[in-house]
From Swiss-Prot:
Homodimer. Catalyzes a salvage reaction resulting in the formation of AMP, that is energically less costly than de novo synthesis. Pathway: Purine metabolism; AMP biosynthesis via salvage pathway; AMP from adenine: step 1/1. This is Adenine phosphoribosyltransferase. Keywords: Cytoplasm, Glycosyltransferase, Purine salvage, Transferase.
Amino acid sequence: MAIDFSKYIASVKDFPNKGIVFRDITPILQDGELYRIATHELAEYAKSRKADVIVGPEARGFIVGCPVATELGLGFVPARKPHKLPREVERASYDLEYGSNSLEMHKDAIKPGQRVVLCDDLMATAGTLRASKELIENLGGKLVGAAFYIELPDLKGREKLPDVDIYSLVQYHGA
């Protein structure tokens, strides 16, 4: 029986800024069985893409990606916000739905030729995904897929990266 994960995602209006509807995944995380099932679904997707490693952007990508990597017995690579990693890094900038930022990965985090699946909580404008893809490719890896709890199709993230296979548990159309 398929689970309708949208029943467990809280919608918070005007957070973090006026006009934004924040999709809060913490109700899923608070339910151990639901979290396990969501993780398993993303892990099955990553397995189908023959991933060698999982990348998760800071911060909720850690929460989503680490258990996927663990379930599959794969390594996990954090894509961190600037100045959080102690060794030499590669950096890429991106725009958010409500601002801009950069992501960094250690220069030795992705091995040449590795097949990478990115896991995160939400894809909106695909800015984080685009920056992560740039980092992965600059380090010699290949982004073979991206898995999200939530996708906001109206923001056309898929259209911005048509060469990336994208999987999501829930899609929210409109506000």
